[in-house]
C-alpha cells in the first residue's frame, strides 16, 4: 500500500466493494488527503441492471463489465486490490483478505446485497440468482441446456416441461 502513496502519514480508508456505491465514493475521495484502497473479489465493476441481458444471451459479459484498475488508475491517492475479505478485526483496525491484511483508519463496507431465501432450502438449491456475471452465465448455460434437452426428445413428443421457465423480479 505504501508504494503507491507518497505521504504515508495520511489517514487510510479501506473500501470493501467495487459496485455503484464503492465507485461513487472513490470519485468523491479523489485528490482528498487520504490513502484509499478499494478491495473487491472481482477486478471489474458490473453494471447489474443489464445482467438479465447476459442470462438471455442478448449481450456479452464484456459489454457490462468495466475494469476497476482502469477506473482507479487515474486517481493518484486510490489503489485497487483483487481479494476476498475473510475477516475484519475491528480492535486492530485491519481487514484480512486473501491478498493480505490492510490497516485502516476508516472502513467503508459497500459489498452489495445477497439474495434472501427466507430459510427456504428448496429455493436456495433449485433457483438461480442474478447478482453477478458468473451467475448470469450459469443461468444462460442452464437455459440453453434445457433447450438442448428438449430437442433431444423423441420427434413429435417434445418434453414441454423442460421449456418452462419462471423469472421473478422484485
Regions found by a protein language model. Name each.
Residues 1-10, 78-166:
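FAD-binding core/adjacent interface of flavoenzyme oxidoreductases
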Residues 2-78, 160-169:
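Beta1-alpha1 glycine-rich phosphate/pyrophosphate-binding loop at the start
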